[in-house]
Amino acid sequence: MQTRLWVTGYRSFELGAFNDKDPKIEVIKRALKENLIDQLENNGLEWIITGGQMGTEQWTCETAIGLKKDFPQLKIALMLPFSNFAANWNQEHQVKLTDLRTRVDFSEALSKESYKSPIQLRNFQAFMLKHTDGALMVYDPDNPGKAEFEYKAIQAYQLEHPDYSLKTIDFDMLTDISNEIEEEKRPW
């Protein structure tokens, strides 16, 4: 049973998705929704725990918030590795993160300090692994990005914790979902 799921993956810039109307986001959100519903219905999912990065993590929060009407037991935690996490982002992106933090069930920065060193990011990974039963990643190992660090950390963790699951949503799956969406939009 996976009651606590870490969801992470590509950042928006890695996918070339720079605005909320980008069709790639619809595809990724559909993939997330399908996978989260499966976890809710079949694996006893109670908590989605994610970070605040622009891209997969924020899309996960938005998707999960939308699922709460059908799955009111679902809880969402948006965790940050350090305080002032979005300090270098433009105003629009900072406001969006602040808004998301008010709409989830729990949000906290693990370190009360501003960014000091990569150890804060490693501590964040360790926290996420320790406080979840498995991970869902929008990630394709054949197309590495910044999420490769999380992917490798999860694989290393699995060596010591073989019950910790990892499911990836890769580009082949995203292509299939994109094709489904296109079929649905066709006027028959």
Curated annotation (Swiss-Prot):
* Annotated InterPro entries: YspA
| Family matches, as Pfam families | YpsA
Gene3D superfamilies per record: 3.40.50.450
The protein's superkingdom reads Bacteria
What the record says about family reads: Belongs to the UPF0398 family.
* Name of this protein: UPF0398 protein OEOE_1093
Record organism: Oenococcus oeni (strain ATCC BAA-331 / PSU-1)
